[in-house]
Amino acid sequence: MNRLRLIKTAYTALAALMLAACASDELTDGTVQDLPEGMYPLQIAGVSITAESNAEPWGADPPQTRMVENTTDGKYSSAWENGDKIKVQIGDVTPGTYTYQSSGLTVADGDAYAYWASKDNNQTIRAWYTSSGNETVDLSDQTKGLAYVVTARTTANFNTEVSLTFSHALAKVRVELTGEIASFVDNVSIKGYTTCTLSQGTWNGANEGEIKMYKVADKVFEANVYPGYQIKEVKVNNGTWSKLTTAVFLEAAKIHKMGIGVTGKTITLSDQTGEVCTVESGKCLIIDGGGNELNKRIAIQDNAKVMLKNVKLAAPTTEVNTIEINGSATLLLSGTNEINGATQGCPLTVIRGTLTINGTDNDKLTLTGENSYNAGCLGLREGASLIINGGDIVADGSKTQHGSGIGAYWTGWNDPRYGSITINGGKINASGGGNSAGIGSGSQCGGGDIIITGGNITATGGGNLGGAGIGTGDYGNCGDITISGTNTVVTATVVKEGCDKIGLGYNGRYCGTVTIKAGVTVNNTKYTSDHVGRIE
């Protein structure tokens, strides 16, 4: 279990009060220094945390009981979590193991006391905590959690109260990425010592190599590394190593911040000679449309990441999709983007895989479907899924027939089914075509779950026979619909009576469980408790 996590505060330490179990006059007559083994345990009376000043510190601050993130004063610090195992050693005897619990250290099941073995003065007492739970810590792969080594050292006379001051034995490296496509970076690595081992009371780093960093947040990566090493190179997205303009020398218990600029290749759409601009699998590109309407199409292959920057595409003259996603891909919105659909083609279609759309409220994507019987607007083909994390997105499928604003659309064969639709944020306005849902399935189409966890969503069912605002089209089906988030606002409407606002369209065959969680606002009603059931 990862026990130590980080918070932003000031550099500090952890103090543990240690007390002998027996008074000195109970032990010997004063002439014998060595004590019987395993007779006189060291006990922990209490734990406190004190602070000390330092430049760019990394420490702890009261009254935290866990290593958690905090933004206080823009500084980093750490604190214990219940269950942390702390080793304590007196001299060279076998270390004891204690468990942190509610601001104190206890000897839990499976633990062992540290024992006094001598009545000597100035005995060395060491204590340490590692994220691995043993005396060898692997620093090479921190993608699933940060590595920690926290140590304390002092001297004390037998049977005296002892205060242990803990500090980080490792250095923290924090990489902050900048640039238009910095959010496309999935992984960052640096070079350093890949292991840290306790030997004869000293922690040593060894085995120089790659250290994979932990993604703390979008565009932010961290790793805790052995000090005394100069970081000279970094790489992103498993690419080649890039040299830093200035090497970073690592010091223990310090935060070392590195700003890394990320650039990508830009394609100016007007310079492309062909009708189709293809983004190959695995590529990261910026497609700059310059704000001018162009007679172009875009094909994006599997695992590609593309920024759409002021792209405006006219409706193709043939029955094709204007933007086509052929596998799992990411779209990052920038500026104003307007995509028009062909007579029998969608403005944007996901053929297979999962499309993820990111953007801010200032980044707009407008998709307009044309008068079509075999297309939708933001279309999802058989098994394809969609995740929207942000952006201002308009999916106007009101001119189409048999296609939803966002979701499945009729393709000329029975029951095409999308995989799932997830909306985590953004401003979304989706209008379904004839017989189709605003968000969900088109006419005679099916699909999986619809999950909304955030954002401001407006969904309008289509006309003719009618579709739900969110849910199914006529003779269609969908999975469960779950809407949550205290700041989530949903407006779901229909143009045909008899259709659910959230649930079934005209003669809808099946809709899974509709759940509106407490805190969500739907059609101007803020739910104070969970609601289960379709919204008519």
What are these regions (language model features)?
Residues 14-15, 67, 231-232, 246, ...:
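Exposed boundary/loop context
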Residues 81-82, 120-124, 190-192, 224-227, ...:
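A composition-driven surface/loop motif
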Residues 2-4, 8, 22-266, 275-276, ...:
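Sec-type signal peptide cleavage vicinity
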Residues 7-15:
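Sec-dependent N-terminal signal peptides
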